[in-house]
Curated annotation (Swiss-Prot):
Pfam families: DUF167
InterPro entries: DUF167, YggU-like_sf
Family (UniProt): Belongs to the UPF0235 family.
Name this polypeptide is given: UPF0235 protein Npun_R3528
Location of the region described as Disordered in the Swiss-Prot/TrEMBL record: 1-23
A single GO cellular-component term on record: cytoplasm
Length: 75
């Protein structure tokens, strides 16, 4: 499964909002420095979708706020 994700680093709280188009807006506490925000993003998405962190990959947008995430789910 692939999801478009818009990341908002340096937020006061962590939360995930689903948008009407199926994309996600993810608010992260971490700054976008040294991959900290990406690590926090993967951790939050793994918890939301109940998968291991290793099952989530950033396909594109590694250094951007607009990302394409791939989630491997055994269904």
């Amino acid at each position: 499964m692939q999801k478009k994700v818009k990341v908002k680093p340096n937020s006061k709280q962590q939360k995930i909002e689903e948008q009407p188009d199926g994309s996600l807006t993810v608010y992260l506490k971490s700054p976008p420095v040294d991959g900290k925000a990406n690590e926090e993003l993967i951790k939050l998405l793994a918890k939301k979708f109940d998968v291991a962190k290793s099952d989530i990959r950033i396909k594109s947008g590694l250094s951007s706020r607009q990302k394409l995430i791939e989630i491997d789910r055994d269904v």
